[in-house]
Amino acid sequence: ISLSPDWTARGEGVPVPEKWAISIGDYTVNEYIGQSHEAQRLFEPGSYSLVVYNPADGITVEGTTATVSASSEAGQDAFISGSPAWFFTAVQDVTIEKDREYLFSVVMKQQIRRLTLIVEPTGKTADLIEGIEGSLSGVAGKIDFATGSHSSPSEVKLDFTKISEGADAGKWMTSVLLLGIADDKQQLSVNMRFIKGSALRPIAIDSDLSAPLAGFNTDKPHPLV
C-alpha cells in the first residue's frame, strides 16, 4: 500500500505541512516527511480504516479525536488556544485484496478556520480608547474528524489591536484560528478601556454572534470576517 496526500483543498496562504501521520489498521507512522509513503509491511485481505493527519502545534490527536490545547498565556487557563497550527485530516475506508498493489490518493481536509472580528467604535470618546480585550464562547475544543462532529464548547481569549491605516483605520481588529463552533450560542464579550486621565470608566459590551457564525464549521479554507 502506498499513500499520497492531496493538500490542494486549503486556504490561500496556508502552507503545506512538512510532516504527516498515517494509520492503517494497526500500522502507524507518527511522523513522515515526503510526498508519498509506501507501507513497510504487507496487509491481509480485508477492510481497513485509513487515517491521515498532520501533527500540529497546539493540537493533540487520539484516534480520530483532535483536541485544542489550553492557552499558554499566563492566567488564561480557562481559555483554549486561539492560535493552533494549521491542521488537516483524512479518513477513508479501503478494501484490500490478495496479491494486489494499491496507491491511494487521500484528499486532506482543512480543519482550522480563521475568524477575524472587527469592532468599530463611534462617538466623541472613540479616540480615547486605550485597549479592547474580550472573549468568544461556544467555540469547539474538540472534533471527531471521522464524523465531522464538533464538541467540548470552550472559550477563546481575544486581544484587539487598533487599525492605523487604510479604509478601516480607527477600527479595532482581532484574528483567531478555530476548529469550529460547538454550541447553539456564540457570545462575544468585550471590555473597552480608556486612556488614563480621561475619567471614563471601562465599558463592557456583549454581542450574540450565533447567527453570523452558524455556518462556521463549513468551508473552512475560506476565512470569515
Regions of interest found by a model, annotated:
Residues L42, V94, S105-Q111:
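Extracellular and analogous surface-interaction loops
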Residues P5, I80-S81, F88-I96, M108, ...:
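Hydrophobic side chains in beta-strands
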Residues Q35-H37, K98-R100, Q111:
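Ser/Thr- and Asn-enriched, surface-exposed coil loops between beta-strands
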Residues I1-W7, V107-T122:
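A short, Gly/Thr-enriched small/hydrophobic beta-strand-prone motif that recurs across taxa
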Residues Y102, T122-G123:
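Compact mixed alphabeta submodule
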Residues E12-T64, L128-T218:
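Tryptophan-paired
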